[in-house]
Swiss-Prot record:
Example GO biological process: ethanolamine biosynthetic process
Native organism taxonomy: Eukaryota, Discoba, Euglenozoa, Kinetoplastea, Metakinetoplastina
Residue intervals on the Extracellular side: 48-73, 169-211, 255-257
Pfam families noted in UniProt: PAP2_C
Active-site residues from the entry: H210, H253, D257
Name this polypeptide is given: Phosphatidylethanolamine:ceramide ethanolaminephosphotransferase
Localization: Membrane
Annotated function: Bidirectional lipid ethanolaminephosphotransferase capable of converting phosphatidylethanolamine (PE) and ceramide to ethanolamine-phosphorylceramide (EPC) and diacylglycerol (DAG) and vice versa. Direction is dependent on the relative concentrations of DAG and ceramide as phosphoethanolamine acceptors. Does not function strictly as a SM synthase. Essential for viability of the pathogenic bloodstream stage of this human protozoan parasite and, consequently, can be considered as potential drug target.
Protein family membership: Belongs to the sphingomyelin synthase family.
Enzyme Commission identifier(s): 2.7.8.-
Chain segments annotated as transmembrane: 27-47, 74-94, 148-168, 212-232, 234-254, 258-278
Topology versus the membrane: Multi-pass membrane protein
A GO molecular-function annotation: sphingomyelin synthase activity
Length: 323
């Protein structure tokens, strides 16, 4: 058995491991990790689908939310619309955060080849931060994306394990006669490419993936949306709560699936936190060993401008003084 080098137990080794990776490297590598986790989740969905209790034998569990809220199966499509709206709003917010970053570093506003009155100003103007401005604006868009994607990857990975461990009877009408998966490879690819919309899986109950993304958008706008416009917080809060209602009222998930997902998402997003170095160093350990997708050292600034270090010796200084 090979003996680990002594340097691994020294302080210098762990200091190197705790040295933050460039933000650009984190963006690329954590996105790659998220794609890998999406494939893991797709496989877990297939396993859960096969392990789901027979609906003809096992009836849905008693649920207080089902007793209080009237059943409207079509509302699950409305929940998807809520998620789609929040996806668009989050992309818009991230772009506005990028404009705030450009304003912070002294770059001008971007310009379109053809100026469209009103439209160009709405999309390309800098909306100066008025709330939650204690957050440093430099690289705020990059750090916000790292925080969002790492939180999402962690939640999907834990969901892949939790929903396989315990199989619950599905309360959804579509899963009372669950469809058979004919082509497993095609199903996995469709699940990843369409974020689950291109395939039907049953039994993936604990916990709700739709609730995870709704709550992630809620937390994203609660922290960063307020930096763009004050109205984003109340709007996203109302949309997210309505989305929770749609999930339970459509009977696609038990109430516990939604409540647990809300708690875990909020706790994970807070634990990851906002840091000028990006993700916590413990998470960076998982991507530090990747042989591709960015450098491990900060040889350039995060704005992409090379840092030039000039060292003058004594003879050069004397020569310049004489000239």
């Amino acid at each position: 058995m090979a003996v680990p080098p002594v340097e691994m137990y020294s302080g210098s080794f762990w200091n190197r491991m705790r040295k933050p990776l460039p933000l650009r490297t984190q963006v690329i590598r954590f996105t790659v990790v998220f794609v890998i986790v999406s494939f893991i989740l797709a496989v877990a969905l297939q396993i859960t689908h096969e392990r789901m209790p027979d609906p003809k034998v096992t009836k849905p569990l008693p649920d207080l939310g089902f007793e209080v809220l009237h059943k409207y199966p079509f509302l699950f499509s409305v929940a998807d619309c809520c998620i789609g709206f929040l996806n668009i709003l989050s992309v818009f917010t991230a772009f506005k955060l990028y404009l705030l970053h450009r304003h912070c570093v002294g770059s001008g506003e971007p310009e379109l080849p053809c100026n469209i009155p009103g439209v160009s100003r709405f999309f390309l103007s800098v909306w100066l931060c008025k709330e939650n401005c204690r957050i440093e604006l430099r690289n705020v868009h990059t750090i916000a994306w790292i925080r969002f994607i790492t939180s999402y990857a962690l939640l999907l990975l834990s969901r892949s394990v939790i929903m396989v461990v315990t199989s619950l009877p599905n309360p959804d009408d579509l899963c009372q006669d669950p469809p058979k998966i004919e082509n497993r490879v095609k199903d996995v690819i469709l699940t990843v490419l369409t974020a689950g919309a291109g395939s039907i899986h049953c039994g993936d109950l604990m916990y709700s993936g739709h609730t995870v993304i709704l709550t992630l958008h809620l937390m994203f706008h609660w922290i960063y949306g307020a930096m763009v416009h004050w109205s984003f917080r109340p709007v996203v809060t109302v949309v997210a709560i309505f989305g929770y209602y749609c999930i339970v009222a459509s009977r696609f998930h038990y109430t516990d699936d939604v409540l647990v997902a809300i708690y875990l998402t909020i706790a994970t997003f807070i634990a990851v936190g906002h840091n000028a170095d990006g993700a916590p160093w413990q998470l960076q350990l998982f991507i530090r060993w990747l042989p591709c997708c960015g450098a491990n050292s900060r040889e350039v600034t995060e704005d992409g401008v090379p840092v030039a270090i000039v060292i003058k010796n004594e003879e050069m200084m004397n020569f310049e003084g004489k000239s």
